[in-house]
UniProtKB/Swiss-Prot annotation:
Gene: mcsB
HAMAP family: Prot_Arg_kinase
Keywords, comma-separated and alphabetical: ATP-binding, Kinase, Nucleotide-binding, Stress response, Transferase
Enzyme Commission numbers on file: 2.7.14.1
Name of this chain's protein: Protein-arginine kinase
Induction (UniProt): Up-regulated by heavy metals such as Cu(2+) and Cd(2+), but Zn(2+) and Co(2+) have no effect. Forms part of an operon with ctsR, mcsA and clpC, which is repressed by CtsR.
Protein's organism: Staphylococcus aureus (strain NCTC 8325 / PS 47)
Length: 335
């Protein structure tokens, strides 16, 4: 069976050329409505559905997906595509609004009433902020958004009060991971109000040496200041990753090549493989491509990291396990 991984990928994720380190960027704005209790305090589901209806009416050009009308697998696919958070699934009255290419999504009734997301692979944080801000303006025209003149936007979590903005950049950092530098980097940037998390944010697991770098606090800084400082932090991490890769290539070339080609051999020949192992093998092959050790036709690290996740492997009506199907996809697309 041929597996068309493009069918499982949001349009914004598809790219002809992948960069060595930056995978994607995201801007998220948290907003709440006046005269409504916060989602975690709803007395009944109807409280949540009223908010869903109000937000949907304010954004008529977006497609509404109510989570109570979806099965668990469909919800998990949306998590894998970063359209919703794992936390949204836990809410009894939750929904998401998405645009055509799924680069913009509006989560309704997560921790806050509204969470606007703008995502892109080759788009600057400033451009993504402009897109998210445009949606925010559209909502503000018809909804009463909670705002305090001194504090800024009022949110459920105190760390989001102020701009209500979280800016984040997804980075592929195999060099720093292999050399065990990530703990030091995380401690350093934490002192400046920034954090490093797993692929799906707070509390999530790290897969394939992939990390999300984002701001922690939003109070007392403008959106532009947050974006500028995060960009500086990300650029410094990228600089260190490049230095480590150069050292691996110069002083540990044989060991690094052995690591790369072992992973390539496993991916091209495996018959069963877990998500965790597959992600790290893919990461090492990507490192080998970036260091010009190997050349593969149409190798798409970002797309494969989504396509091999369990929710996308449960559709096919056969008796194969998820591990077998994952191995089939990898052998088919890594040649």
């Amino acid at each position: 069976m041929t597996h068309n991984i493009h069918d499982n990928i949001s349009q914004w994720m598809k790219s002809n050329e992948e960069t060595p380190i930056v995978m994607s960027s995201r801007i998220r704005l948290a907003r709440n409505l006046e005269n409504h209790v916060h989602p975690l305090m709803y007395a009944t589901e109807n409280d949540g559905f009223r908010v869903i209806n109000e937000v949907q009416d304010a954004l008529p050009n977006f497609e509404l997906m109510r989570l109570d009308q979806m099965d668990q697998q469909s919800k998990m696919k949306m998590v894998a595509k970063h359209l919703i958070s794992p936390e949204l699934i836990k809410q009894p009255a939750a929904a998401v609004l998405v645009n055509d290419d799924e680069s913009l999504s509006v989560m309704i009734n997560e921790e806050d009433h509204i969470r606007i997301q703008a995502m892109g692979t080759d788009t600057t944080l400033q451009a993504l902020y402009n897109q998210a801000s445009s949606i925010d303006d559209e909502l503000d025209r018809s909804l009463d958004i909670s705002y305090d003149e001194q504090l800024g936007y009022l949110t459920t979590c105190p760390t989001n009060i102020g701009t209500g903005m979280r800016a984040s950049v997804m980075l592929h950092l195999p060099g720093l991971s292999i050399m065990k530098r990530m703990t030091r980097i995380a401690q350093t940037i934490n002192r400046f109000g920034y954090t490093i998390r797993g692929i799906y944010g707070e509390g999530s697991q790290v897969y394939g040496h992939t990390y999300q770098v984002s701001n922690q606090l939003t109070l007392g800084k403008s959106e532009l200041e947050i974006i500028e400082t995060l960009t500086e932090v990300v650029n410094q991490i990228i600089h260190e990753e490049k230095q480590i890769r150069q050292k691996l290539d110069t002083y540990n070339q044989l060991e690094t090549q052995d690591r790369v080609f072992r992973s390539l051999g496993i991916l091209q020949n495996c018959r069963m493989i877990t998500m965790e192992e597959a992600s790290y093998r893919l990461s090492e092959v990507k490192l080998g491509i970036d260091l010009n050790y190997i050349e593969l036709q149409n190798f798409k690290f970002n797309e494969l990291m989504v396509a091999i996740q369990s929710p996308f492997l449960l559709d096919e009506e056969d008796d194969k396990s998820v591990k077998e199907k994952r191995a089939d996809i990898l052998r088919e697309h890594i040649k």
